[in-house]
Amino acid sequence: MTNIRKTHPLMKIVNNAFIDLPAPSNISSWWNFGSLLGICLILQILTGLFLAMHYTSDTMTAFSSVTHICRDVNYGWIIRYMHANGASMFFICLFIHVGRGLYYGSYTFLETWNIGVILLFTVMATAFVGYVLPWGQMSFWGATVITNLLSAIPYIGTNLVEWIWGGFSVDKATLTRFFAFHFILPFIIAALAMVHLLFLHETGSNNPTGIPSDADKIPFHPYYTIKDILGALLLILSLMLLVLFAPDLLGDPDNYTPANPLNTPPHIKPEWYFLFAYAILRSIPNKLGGVLALISSILVLILMPLLHTSKQRSMIFRPLSQCLFWILVADLLTLTWIGGQPVEHPFIIIGQLASILYFLIILVLMPIISTIENNLLKW
């Protein structure tokens, strides 16, 4: 009798994706983050579902409904903080996952990479609309500032902003539609993640050497299932340490003040995972220029396959490119720090230099260094 997992129409799909999938024998722990992102997504959908059962998307009651969840609902506080800090873990995994793709040249899988960039945009959109829901000061002013950026679009900008707001300011209509978006987007992310996996399994995984591994494959189960379970345990451990010991570490104290349109907070800033893009936005004095730079900071990832001039796929044997990669990581950390600082000297100039360096490394220096490395190897 043949095994049911190989014959049953549904089980066959699961089997080919998670059990009998031929995987390279040498993929390191940097390859764990795809599965961790899946776990983060499931965790966010589940905690979000329970939060939505008690949340009300009305400007008069949104803030107090979140307080009610934390104080009166059984284990509401842990669900709320798992959801808030789960978003941070999601973005940590996301940034490492993208960084891994850049380092090991995984962007040469064009379809997988492009779907991944779309996924990144979608997750960022979801996190943004979600941050508005508690209706604290930073929620309200963050929504006002970021949606207002669309007014920089020539001719249709102002109409577009008012259309998104559902009125002439961020108000009840905005909150209601943001809640609707925040509820539907994770399911769109889940669907896109399946397409992402579908394209990945067409080509098979990359590996640290960047060399085709067709000659040396091992089954996904039990080797990588065990490895993924270890990663998942470490993820849940770090999340629970954050939730139980420092739940407000990554949040903004201003968001514990109910939204007040008449009182602007001294420093409007988004959550930490948007600070690098926010710093790039602020470093350009022109509104439209800032918006274009903001979008380009993520959209530049789509160009990575075109900018790959090296004759080797991975950076593992390219020390000059490695140096440049880690300078880029340091630059992004600098931008994240600058995004959280007030707009004053010396932070303005540091932000501008870091923003220039970011685009310079990706668009100019990396292709040049790769060509130099080719010449050094007489290729």
From Swiss-Prot:
Heme b b566 binds at H97, H196. InterPro entries: Cyt_b/b6_C, Cyt_b/b6_C_sf, Cyt_b/b6_N, Cytb/b6-like_sf, Cytochrome_b, Cytochrome_b_C_euk/bac, Cytochrome_b_N_euk/bac, Di-haem_cyt_TM. Keywords: Electron transport, Heme, Iron, Membrane, Metal-binding, Mitochondrion, Mitochondrion inner membrane, Respiratory chain, Transmembrane, Transmembrane helix, Transport, Ubiquinone. Coiled coil: none annotated. CDD domains: cytochrome_b_C (cd00290), Cytochrome_b_N (cd00284). It is found in: Mitochondrion inner membrane. Gene3D superfamilies: Cytochrome Bc1 Complex, Chain C. It is a multi-pass membrane protein. Heme b b562 binds at H83, H182. One of its GO terms (biological process) is mitochondrial electron transport, ubiquinol to cytochrome c. A ubiquinone binds at H201. The chain crosses the membrane at residues 33-53, 77-98, 113-133, 178-198, 226-246, 288-308, 320-340, 347-367. Binds 2 heme b groups non-covalently. GO terms for molecular function: metal ion binding; ubiquinol-cytochrome-c reductase activity. Its cofactor is heme b. One of its GO terms (cellular component) is mitochondrial inner membrane. Its main location: mitochondrion. Pfam families: Cytochrom_B_C, Cytochrome_B. Component of the ubiquinol-cytochrome c reductase complex (complex III or cytochrome b-c1 complex) that is part of the mitochondrial respiratory chain. The b-c1 complex mediates electron transfer from ubiquinol to cytochrome c. Contributes to the generation of a proton gradient across the mitochondrial membrane that is then used for ATP synthesis. PANTHER family: CYTOCHROME B. Belongs to the cytochrome b family. The cytochrome bc1 complex contains 11 subunits: 3 respiratory subunits (MT-CYB, CYC1 and UQCRFS1), 2 core proteins (UQCRC1 and UQCRC2) and 6 low-molecular weight proteins (UQCRH/QCR6, UQCRB/QCR7, UQCRQ/QCR8, UQCR10/QCR9, UQCR11/QCR10 and a cleavage product of UQCRFS1). This cytochrome bc1 complex then forms a dimer. Heme 1 (or BL or b562) is low-potential and absorbs at about 562 nm, and heme 2 (or BH or b566) is high-potential and absorbs at about 566 nm. This is Cytochrome b. It comes from Muntiacus reevesi.
